[in-house]
Amino acid sequence: MSRIGKKPVDLPAGVSASVSGQTIEIKGPKGTRAFKATDDVTLTVEDNVVTVTPRGKSKRARQQWGMSRTMVANLVTGVSEGFKKELEIQGVGYRAAMTGNTLKLNLGLSHDVDYTPPAGVTVTAPKQTEIVVEGIDEQLVGQVAANIRQWRKPEPYKGKGIRYKGEFVFRKEGKKK
């Protein structure tokens, strides 16, 4: 039995769901998202509650049961509240600024890095050393944050680079004389 799959997904006020075949469409104040489940599970919507049930007792059906329930829960969270990743920049001269829709990063390279986020994701730089990535698709928000972090990962000696807010960077001791 899947402990996650057994839990029903409650729809908050202002969020509606409709099922057609194996596809569930969730509409909310921030937008609309859809998810196509595999044939191993059944999706039902009753009284503002989405339930996912397996169609058999196979291992794959049980795996898809929990995963499908989590995907539906993430869709509901995305269209009602949205997802947010915060990044910090540490290092002398490292900074970020928004120019129109493009994020301009000065990271100690010989050139500035210009990053244009994909559709559905909003990137802002409230301070020179902070970057906020927001959107309704959790996977896309995480991927955009990872792509930005990829330009200058935190290094272990001085801790310079782009890191997630609250991320711990293991520090190493330098060379000894």
From Swiss-Prot:
GO terms for biological process: cytoplasmic translation. GO terms for molecular function: rRNA binding; structural constituent of ribosome. InterPro entries: Ribosomal_uL6-like, Ribosomal_uL6-like_a/b-dom_sf, Ribosomal_uL6_a/b-dom, Ribosomal_uL6_bac-type, Ribosomal_uL6_CS. It holds the Pfam family Ribosomal_L6. SUPFAM superfamilies: Ribosomal protein L6 (SSF56053). GO terms for cellular component: cytosolic large ribosomal subunit. Keywords: Ribonucleoprotein, Ribosomal protein, RNA-binding, rRNA-binding. The keyword Lipid metabolism does not apply. This protein binds to the 23S rRNA, and is important in its secondary structure. It is located near the subunit interface in the base of the L7/L12 stalk, and near the tRNA binding site of the peptidyltransferase center. Belongs to the universal ribosomal protein uL6 family. Part of the 50S ribosomal subunit. This is Large ribosomal subunit protein uL6.
